[in-house]
Amino acid sequence: MSAAVQAKPQSRLLLSGNDAIARGVWEAGAKVAAAYPGTPSTEILESLSLYPDLYAEWSVNEKVAMEVAIGGSMSGARAFCAMKHVGLNVASDAFMTVTVAGVIGGLVIAVADDVGMSSSQNEQDSRFWGRFAHVPVLEPADSQEAYEMAKYAFELSEAYNTPVILRLTTRVCHVKAVVQVGEKVRHDIGGFKSDARRWVMTPANAKGLLPAQIAREGKLQALAEASPMNFLDDGSDKRIGFVTSGPAYMHVRESFPDAPVLKLGFTYPVPVALVEKLAAEVEHLVVVEETEPLMERELKAAGMQAIHGKDLLPRLGELTPNVLIPAIKTFLGEPLPPTTTYPKFDPFPRPPTMCAACPHMGVYYSLARMRKNVQISGDIGCYTLGAGHPWNALDSTISMGASMGIALGMDKARSEETKDKAVVAVIGDSTFLHMGMQGLLDIVYNRGNVTVLILDNRTTGMTGGQNHAGTGKGLNGDDTPRVDFVRLVEALGVKPERISKIDPYVLPVVFKTIKRETAIPEVSVIITDRPCVLSEFYTKIEPYKVIDDDCTGCGNCINVGCPAITVKRSESKVRPDGKVNELKFTTIDTAMCTGCHMCVESCGPNAIVLAKPARAAE
């Protein structure tokens, strides 16, 4: 069990922001917690699941996680859900309605923005949801604040009958800092009490609740002005002052230690009066916020036209000292500090790649062989890497589950150039259960000519191997019912004869199955069945090696894409017709090889054989 779970009150621990939030949620007496894994928020629920006296689950998607938390709150329990920024897009339907209905038990939503897009398809700013939904937004700058704000958010939620957004960023989620923890409070569950006028959100009922939602925002404005989470770090250099929030506060303090800084933790509603007070004391006021100029716009709308923000600073990425110092010093007309120059060396190229023996490679190896004749709509997951070398076998990746709808759109919008091309959708098991089922049903319903590949590797791989409804395991590893994908897609209307379940390691079968199904003008589903090589379900067997004298340099094994296979020698050979063949002679890292044998099946001259264990040769 982790040190955070065992820690006694007043203990000081080194915790990531995610672990600190989990401790704060537990100490606040929360009883229900739900999430769908998504970087950088994943570890919050993983950590929460270790605490006693709390129910925690992986939900099939963020909307369901939100609804589970809402149900807990309606029943009088303190409830929590977590997601990455794009997850709130999925959950927004339920979220935007519960903001009108309000809460019984405190309801806290942790939303982690991926500033800098280290693992996301966009950089949207979740603070917008506070404005949109008229709910308070809290922004921690470090792990200690993340812990404290998580606890406070439940009190705030219950006191003002509102969900509360805890806006995080990748930096807060993953950086570790010292946190002093406290005691768990007891919060009794009152139980669900039927109240149709409040919980049955018909137009008539919702109209009656809207005035309270609007009035609540004014009360929250006054609360933000007096909140101890908003404080001034005074400074002697009055030429410039800063208003900032989140981890940008740390960067501002490091960059300009002598300047006054108004640090906002309760960031919506914006405490305008506090900002006006600082503005009166400095020559120039700069709003430093990641990523969108939300506070800047609202302060200007309140009449503070002289402030600066995104006219000096970028809207993209983290606002680190390397960004702040040159921008602000140039604005002040000061010389930039001397920098130490070092010889510049280009880093060794390390493109993202799949793991050795990843079962997805067999699918993309086959798709790459028929690339000229297919349009391929991809999805979110490890298999997004199929867009890269050596496969180049994806045409689109937009959002979770989008492969289905986009593939249908491609099918219905064929041109003269594409009318004879097959349309393929590629989606993973967890993503299919998250948001792909509806898309497949739409393909069936609208008679689409799409071949759907469901890559079942029995895990949510990209975020770290979390369980889901298709693994047969829950958040804590306990046994649960496992979805049968064959029966599921048949229930969605796919004809039984158009459903294939194959082993992605058997390359001839993969190629023949895809070729057969793409030639048939109706919806078909191919389910690959091999566990992720990093999961508990995978069994490693004896590795392979290349016999140098038998290798012809054809490069077929390289095209499988396995990182255990590398080129050790290249040659150019002139053919009798004058064309030049580039030969690639390969070797296999036996320490990395798991014995999947995909490379063996790709090798025409049979130059790849089982490597003998060293002890067997003695």
PLM regions and their residue ranges:
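Short beta-alpha connecting loops at secondary-structure transitions
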Residues: 54, 112-116, 133-138, 308-313, ...
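Short helix-loop-beta junction
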Residues: 47-53, 252-262, 488-495
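Thiamine diphosphate
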Residues: 1-143, 235, 259-261, 301-527, 537-539, ...
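Conserved thiamine diphosphate
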Residues: 114-163, 169, 201-207, 352, ...
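Flexible, low-complexity linker and terminal segments
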Residues: 2-18, 22, 28, 140-354, ...
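Short acidic, glycine/serine/threonine-rich loops at helix termini
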Residues: 44-47, 70, 91-95, 117-124, ...
